[in-house]
Swiss-Prot record:
GO terms for cellular component: cytoplasm; nucleoplasm; nucleus; transcription regulator complex. It comes from Mus musculus. InterPro entries: Abd-B_homeobox_TF, HD, HD_metazoa, Homeobox_CS, Homeodomain-like_sf, Hox9_activation_N, HXA9/HXB9/HXC9. Transmembrane segments: none annotated. This is Homeobox protein Hox-A9. Expressed in high level in the embryonic and adult spinal cord with a preference in the posterior region.
Length: 271
């Protein structure tokens, strides 16, 4: 209880008077021996003589000589930042940065930032790390002069990243090439022996209609007026004279008879 009360009084003095005044008072009022080993722990070690004392070797200094040692009063006194009492959750701003260990090594305070921390743009930093901050404020008129290969925050300030600006001219050229290929290029011929191609591109089996010439139509009309029905021999002769097939002559006569029948029916209705 005596040790706890001494530490509490020291912390109150350091808070009211400051770190330097508290160190001077602590050096004269509180001896370093008050923070030594408790008597209960010493008695426990004396009761177990079988266990050998600890023989760990002291480690090498973690940091080099660039760390400046604190003055004697601050080294002997206990820092207020290390002993954090639950009644005072905040730390005095003038707390010492480093404390001296018994073996001469200097331990780093937990209040300082680690060396691996990065400094962001717009935030104050205690030491430079060689990182160039990106400019956050950019006008829309400055965006076309920027290099499109460097990706920064100013590219997004203009409304579109550089990748989209590169795609726009390439898409226009691609559409022009497609238009030229569709207009100038012919489709590849379809293999008639391929059943898949025939099924996908189904075509009608009906032959293309070939109109008769005027001479052929005139001769067929004369033959129809002479006889509406042709015999097989006469059909063969007419097909040979007009350079047609017998089937073509036969179909023409059938169509001509249907046409004449329709005309006669229309005449009967008019009368």
């Amino acid at each position: 209880m005596a040790t706890t009360g001494a530490l509490g009084n020291y912390y109150v003095d350091s808070f009211l008077l400051g770190a330097d005044a508290a160190d001077e008072l602590g050096a004269g009022r509180y001896a370093p021996g008050t923070l030594g080993q408790p008597p209960r722990q010493a008695a426990a070690l004396a009761e177990h003589p079988d266990f050998s004392p600890c023989s760990f070797q002291s480690k090498a200094a973690v940091f080099g000589a660039s760390w400046n040692p604190v003055h004697a009063a601050g080294a002997n006194a206990v820092p207020a930042a290390v002993y954090h009492h639950h009644h005072h959750p905040y730390v005095h701003p003038q707390a010492p940065v480093a404390a001296a260990a018994p073996d001469g090594r200097y331990m780093r305070s937990w209040l300082e930032p680690t060396p691996g921390a990065l400094s962001f743009a717009g935030l104050p930093s205690s030491r430079p790390y060689g990182i160039k901050p990106e400019p956050l404020s950019a006008r829309r008129g400055d965006c076309p002069t920027l290099d499109t290969h460097t990706l920064s925050l100013t590219d997004y300030a203009c409304g579109s990243p550089p990748v989209d600006r590169e795609k726009q001219p390439s898409e226009g050229a691609f559409s022009e090439n497609n238009a030229e290929n569709e207009s100038g290029g012919d489709k590849p011929p379809i293999d008639p022996n391929n059943p898949a191609a025939n099924w996908l591109h189904a075509r009608s089996t009906r032959k293309k209609r070939c109109p008769y010439t005027k001479h052929q139509t005139l001769e067929l009309e004369k033959e129809f007026l002479f006889n509406m029905y042709l015999t097989r021999d006469r059909r063969y002769e007419v097909a040979r004279l007009l350079n047609l097939t017998e089937r073509q002559v036969k179909i023409w006569f059938q169509n001509r008879r249907m046409k004449m029948k329709k005309i006669n029916k229309d005449r009967a209705k008019d009368e």
